[in-house]
Amino acid sequence: MTSQVSSILSRISSPTDLKNLSLAELSLLAEQMRHKIISVLTNTGGHLASNLGIIEVTIALHYVFSSTEDKFIFDVGHQAYPHKLLTGRNTEEFDRIRHDGGLSGFTSPSESMHDLFFSGHAGNALSLALGMAKATEDSRTHILPILGDAAFSCGLTLEALNNISSNLSKFIVILNDNNMSISQNVGVMSKNLSRWIHHPKFSLFSRKIEKWLTKIPRYGNGISKRSHKLSTCLKSLFCPIPIFEQFNLAYMGPVDGHNIKRLISVFQTARDLPFPVLIHICTTKGKGLEIAQENPEKYHGVTANFNSSEKNKLLPTIKPQLTYPDVFGQTVCKLGETSPNLHIVTPAMSLGSRLEAFKEKFPKRFIDVGIAEGHAVTFSAGIAKAKSPVICSIYSTFLHRALDNVFHDVCLQGLPVILAIDRAGLAYGDGCSHHGIYDISFLRAMPNMIICQPRSAIVLQQLLQSSLQWNMPSAIRYPNIAAIQRDPIATDVNMHRDPGLGEILSQGEDILIIGLGHMCNTALSIKLQLLTHGISATVVDPVFIKPFDNNLFSILLMHHSKVIIIEEHSIRGGLASEFNDFLATYGFKVDVLHFGIPDAFFSHGDKESLLKRVGLDTESMVKRILTHFNFRTKTSPSNKLSIV
């Protein structure tokens, strides 16, 4: 990387600085930004391939439009790294992106006036943009939603398309087609004809002709309609996506998303059109990094501390042990062999949910529906209705989008759909839009729903196998962290688990600690620390949040008046809420100390610091326990303990 290239990015403190650059300098800037993103993500991890693919598009957008006067609305927002570099955030905070003291991995209004919305979920940009366009239709503001091709599998995007009015001006949809999944443009003749037939002057001329034809007495409307159909048919010969014309969007494209000169020209033309436009831009995901271009899905997101040397080949860090998603992926593969009708459904998360092996082994029973969470759940309900076992694998944060589908199509029908809720708990680097800390609260309220969480790898295996026999709607939630392998209590992988039965992990006399899922390990660590103060604790894993083990806890509360609940979930509506309902129903009067995620939004951060921020680190909890219960150190701990 030359000093000339390095000096270009250092001169960019705001998008207005782009106006003074030549086309050659803009191309060098793109090269430098690519190098910067690769270099930073080598240390921090983050979304790689999508950001490498949208650099030239971002440069051209900021060159032609103003992100302070015009409105850039990024769908998902994980592809906004180049946007951050051009809007005054090429700082030390960018070098720590997704980590403590660093920038968010998504757009964030708290960071910059150039970011309009907190983002993280797909498919909402077009709806947000239409709302803004309606409120600003008499102004000079251009509204620019920027969507990837995958967003068009979202029902919300299609609903927004249906709501577009031809009267909107200064409304420009940017379609970043980085997979060529929508269309393939073949041959020089097709390219040249497409450029001519979709030239904005052709669209403008065509609309003027149609408007003039409607003024002909008696026959005007009919002639105009036939003229429009003829125009549409002509376009359909060369246009990869004639459907957009039916939604009042003039189509422009395909456009080479890595040709800055062409992009600037197209954006300048679209800027001056008096009707809504969709610009179809074709980009290469992972552009500039060979291995990411060859496998863009694998390098969509990368972990920290990978090696970017050796001819640009990235070598992801080898994980020391299996994560809960790894265990899930291995288990469903085994279940696929023993349950020949088992289907797995996922909304575009096959790689993250470790379903590639099942997909390869049982391709006819694996269904990736795209970014369509509601459809994934209802589709699964249809499979269950047809008497086939089905697991719908879905991230906790994305399950929010399928709430009505879970209620109406699964629980109300009493169908045995198994929700495998991945990424339950804090999302750390991905931040507030991705924390999986709300699902228990809305699932608890649904009749017929079983909710459980494993504390270890073997319990996850047991729950997955057992859920196929429950014949009821169920949710098995688990985090994306290293799975606890050693579990002396649970030793038989094939042990069947009936809903509503918890387990005592360790017996004590002074206090009862209830840990949810992987927090049982934290509970056992706290138990050991309390022992140094002469305090003995019983540690219990409820396993099931719903149905709750009323019998077990009724017996335990006959011997314990002090209770601690630890869960990596919102304090509203989680395990503690279920426990409080139990207390109210059975009339127990006990002192309860609850550790959960406070009722607020928490941004990204490293695991240790984020746990400390929400009060779920062991040191903070022990201090609160000693203070809350006013424990005084005993001379010697109880010897009636059985630590497992």
Swiss-Prot record:
GO biological process: 1-deoxy-D-xylulose 5-phosphate biosynthetic process; isopentenyl diphosphate biosynthetic process, methylerythritol 4-phosphate pathway; terpenoid biosynthetic process; thiamine biosynthetic process
Binding residues annotated for thiamine diphosphate, in chain numbering: H78, G120, H121, A122, A150, A151, N178, E373
Molecular-function GO term, any one: thiamine pyrophosphate binding
Cofactor(s) the record lists: Mg(2+); thiamine diphosphate
Record-level GO cellular component terms: cytosol
Swiss-Prot/TrEMBL catalytic activity: D-glyceraldehyde 3-phosphate + pyruvate + H(+) = 1-deoxy-D-xylulose 5-phosphate + CO2
Pathway, per record: Metabolic intermediate biosynthesis; 1-deoxy-D-xylulose 5-phosphate biosynthesis; 1-deoxy-D-xylulose 5-phosphate from D-glyceraldehyde 3-phosphate and pyruvate: step 1/1
CDD domains: TPP_DXS (cd02007), TPP_PYR_DXS_TK_like (cd07033)
Cofactor note: Binds 1 Mg(2+) ion per subunit.
InterPro entries reported in the protein's UniProt record: Dxylulose-5-P_synthase, THDP-binding, Transketo_C/PFOR_II, Transketolase-like_Pyr-bd, Transketolase_C, Transketolase_CS
Annotated Mg(2+) binding sites: D149, N178
Entry keywords, A to Z: Isoprene biosynthesis, Magnesium, Metal-binding, Thiamine biosynthesis, Thiamine pyrophosphate, Transferase
UniProt-listed Enzyme Commission number(s): 2.2.1.7
Pfam families reported in the protein's UniProt record: DXP_synthase_N (PF13292), Transket_pyr (PF02779), Transketolase_C (PF02780)
Known partners and oligomeric status: Homodimer.
Family stated for the protein in its record: Belongs to the transketolase family. DXPS subfamily.
HAMAP family, sorted: DXP_synth (MF_00315)
Purpose of the protein: Catalyzes the acyloin condensation reaction between C atoms 2 and 3 of pyruvate and glyceraldehyde 3-phosphate to yield 1-deoxy-D-xylulose-5-phosphate (DXP).
Name under which the protein is recorded: 1-deoxy-D-xylulose-5-phosphate synthase
Lineage: Bacteria, Pseudomonadati, Chlamydiota, Chlamydiia, Chlamydiales
